[in-house]
Amino acid sequence: TSYHAGLSAKNYLEEVLNLKVFCMYPTQFHRSEKVFNKKTLVIGMSQGGQSLSTVEGLDAATTQGLYTAAVSENPTALVFDHATTKTRIEVGNEKCGAKTKGYAGTTVTLMMMLSEWAIAKGILSEESFEGYKERMFKVIGNMPNIVNAATEWYGRIKDEFLPAKRIIVVGYDGNYADVLEGALKVLETVRQGVTGYDIEE
């Protein structure tokens, strides 16, 4: 879910920062990633904060002499001890296994913290940031309509949907991270065979 949140924030971050953003699993970073620009910031995300793979990724970044930041909902997160800076995901603790607030919360936290950094560095103006925030609030305000439309859609297709033995979630461009996260949530909650694809694949 944290990886998907990074993918979800990526396009916005590249647009605002005018910098290349790479998303990868912490184990891949720890085991094989070489970073040649020592001004690189590596952000380790873990909603629960105790992910040992995220700790290993942050430690690998430190060993390479890179900047590190940790993001977690947990105020006493282990990942906070392995990064230079820490930022809380303010969504509250989710008691169920399928983390839904954490996905949205991590995505927005990344967007906000790096927008503030961009403002401080003179990369992004306050006026532009206000425009982005207005668009975000508009999307959030439209969520009840989306939920209602999705519920109505399910009501129309449930008799065909329930006997399914395999589910495929598709999407594209800025929604691809949502495809991956949606497939994961179906797997975690419905326990049915599910795959997420870019719609062109």
Predicted regions span which residues?
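Short, structured loop/turn "capping" segments at alpha-beta junctions
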Residues: 123-126, 154, 193
